[in-house]
Amino acid sequence: MPGVARPPLPLLSLPLLLLLLLLPRAGRPLDLADYTYDLGEEDAPELLNYKDPCKAAAFLGDIALDEEDLRAFQVQQAAVLRQQTARRPSIKAAGNSSALGGQGTSGQPQRESRGRWRGRPRSRRAATSRPERVWPDGVIPFVIGGNFTGSQRAVFRQAMRHWEKHTCVTFLERTDEDSYIVFTYRPCGCCSYVGRRGGGPQAISIGKNCDKFGIVVHELGHVIGFWHEHTRPDRDRHVSIVRENIQPGQEYNFLKMEVQEVESLGETYDFDSIMHYARNTFSRGIFLDTIVPKYEVNGVKPSIGQRTRLSKGDIAQARKLYKCPACGETLQDSTGNFSSPEYPNGYSAHMHCVWRISVTPGEKIILNFTSMDLYRSRLCWYDYVEVRDGFWRKAPLRGRFCGGKLPEPIVSTDSRLWVEFRSSSNWVGKGFFAVYEAICGGDVKKDNGHIQSPNYPDDYRPSKVCIWRIQVSEGFHVGLTFQSFEIERHDSCAYDYLEVRDGHSESSNLIGRYCGYEKPDDIKSTSSRLWLKFVSDGSINKAGFAVNFFKEVDECSRPNRGGCEQRCLNTLGSYKCSCDPGYELAPDKRRCEAACGGFLTKLNGSITSPGWPKEYPPNKNCIWQLVAPTQYRISLQFDFFETEGNDVCKYDFVEVRSGLTADSKLHGKFCGSEKPEVITSQYNNMRVEFKSDNTVSKKGFKAHFFSDKDECSKDNGGCQQDCVNTFGSYECQCRSGFVLHDNKHDCKEAGCEHKVTSTSGTITSPNWPDKYPSKKECTWAISSTPGHRVKLTFVEMDIESQPECAYDHLEVFDGRDAKAPVLGRFCGSKKPEPVLATGNRMFLRFYSDNSVQRKGFQASHSTECGGQVRADVKTKDLYSHAQFGDNNYPGGVDCEWVIVAEEGYGVELVFQTFEVEEETDCGYDYIELFDGYDSTAPRLGRYCGSGPPEEVYSAGDSVLVKFHSDDTISKKGFHLRYTSTKFQDTLHSRK
């Protein structure tokens, strides 16, 4: 599991340092190679320079160590190190590649280390002797890189708010601070430096599969100043290290710190710490323990390695490390209250309390004191409550209060308030009581900032109306970029929405009304003002939105045109260089060089990636524009294809469009090693774009193109209904309910019985989209994968209307034929709600009489997992997903099946195939079995990994099968068979 160690800022033990000092890189001076330059957003021209943990001098699990500490220790401990070497001759030199060596590249969250130590030892200091590693005033500025999705950004913010909620640490969007953290996606997976490094930005790498809440909380623990709990000097009294089960080369991750090197701040060993390794971290096998607790707590062996939330020990140590006041807290709810200690019974002397009120950016805080009874003094010198307009003690003072007079309500200018209470005497008065409330919207007069929906990154609240009026400096425009967007979807955004207008009022020109899950494009006002309105109704709530605003500058109007050699294009918040035809940007993104790609008018030919057949170079962007004569179509066939693979083709890819511009109809975006199918243009032109990033290079692609006359483009090829162009010819086709005439051009009515076995598709009335014929009866028998219910969703409906649908109608049955129960009879023009079968079969029957004809209907059929199924003596099948065997299971799935046998019988489950993402505690993807109808029944087991579990027998007449998958790695899934059985006394399960 990605690790965080809780002893704040301890350093390395001598056995560990021996390994470090023997590395061949020990003498390398720190240079610019230790820094990574990241564009953030794809076209950003300014480079972001940060301290890269993936290029650290050495690693301890997921902890990055820099050379400053290693050099210092090398000087101070040389003599002691020689003595330690003599006592422990069995330790191998780090230069031996079979034990220790160069940098690995694992990005898996359960594998925190790249598996190697590099560099020199860390200086030997206690936590309290390194105050520069503690963030001043507990304020940690941050930047989130541009390569993360909206959901990932939300996870990062939730993790930061989790630390803020329980400690006095504050995470703040960076403005002009020199030292700050940068969330990046780096090849080393999950890793971070411990504490503040100073002197500039430092990265926290959230690589592949690291974007889980608990893992991010853990990595932030390193940033705050914690090491792994199991490295404490007293750990041998609490846990045993099972060294024979540790992966070869990973033993150093279990070395123990010396007493002089660790400051545990007086806290006891914490099995529950989020900074503790799990039982099988770096294990040779998933069921082999590497760390085992030595004793029981409350009668059971404690579990270790949780990645769910901060433990009480984590919170206590963080509060001690950052010297949090003994009373007070961080308040994050939209409404709340707080009071002086022991209110209303009087407070004690020498009290110091701090309350940090933090609501969503874009909201303001109204603070009301409802009771005030403090010792009164001149200038409130002795006892007072102080309110500051911001996140810390140096924020602008809004008032210092004492005595008995109630202050006027205070409204913050931003989303944070700092409230501090101090007492110097024992006062018999009540103290004070205050309430606060978050209000959204208002006037925002500044040149840059952030606005988020109420309660972001959690779901926004119902029945909210928020209006923001943004104003930047005169002479500038307002730029708006969306970081995250998820608002209840509706075709016309009638329920929940964000509305943007180009001005300062509701009567200004409408730029757009937005909802759904796609981030809107960047927005630029025509003046220095912009108007935003967010509305939510009383029902469905989503994660909402996060948007940045800023004053927009035209960098291309400067004398040097942004340093561009040929062309400068102003973009929102930035600019980019471009080149004249025949040229392309060089790797520095400013100069131009001879381009790949080109404008091709030949009827046939070939194109290849740059450098073919060798690996293509980094940072290339090639565009081919293919043009054929009118009435021709262009086909593209790939002979070889190999690019850097990614689920969303984000890095290297080939993009094919019908048309010549970047917004033409997209045929596909391709990457990886699978050759795309033949692609045929919609018109007489095609655009092929190849793009590579600055990292992994592959062999690329080779493709040939050819042009063919489209006979269908003129008079529909003489076809009565549909004409389909083929290479060198064409063919006529008929719509649903018709067959092709012997003349191969006309269509005649035919039988209208259909058997549908695909997991998804479209069903239409005969002759759609034209009017259906009279006196027609059509049926569709839909069957899907066992365990998956058929769902029918209507796209369009226009059938002759009648109150009882007695004339023309569509009837839907819950089963294999018209004898099954009726799910609905439909007619008219109102689109019905989706129809869901109880099983994997659905039967449709369409009927038209001899009078009125309409357009008909169009519907899509799909599947939904789960439901109740019946077990009997005949063996039946159940599959994890409808496309089992063809595709891996999808992400973000939660399915529940209840398998019920007749009374007096049990249920037997036998897995035929089982392949689910593997994780120590089966916390990501898993199947879970319960001996009953719901999850309150006894659990039979939770399973993940590969290889089918043993047979499972229920003790009662039902079994609940739950299947969960997250949104990252997917596998083949499972296939199980179930039957009813009399043998209920045997239960096989494996947890």
Swiss-Prot record:
Domain CUB: 327-439, 440-551, 596-707, 752-864, 865-981
Any Pfam family the entry gives: CUB
Main localization (coarse): Golgi
Disulfide bonds: C168-C324, C188-C210, C190-C191, C327-C353, C380-C402, C440-C466, C493-C515, C556-C568, C564-C577, C579-C592, C596-C622, C649-C671, C712-C723, C719-C732, C734-C747, C752-C778, C805-C827, C865-C895, C922-C944
Residue ranges of every copy of the Peptidase M12A domain listed in the record: 126-325
Residues of the active site: E219
Function of the molecule: Metalloprotease that plays key roles in regulating the formation of the extracellular matrix (ECM) via processing of various precursor proteins into mature functional enzymes or structural proteins. Thereby participates in several developmental and physiological processes such as cartilage and bone formation, muscle growth and homeostasis, wound healing and tissue repair.
Protein name: Bone morphogenetic protein 1
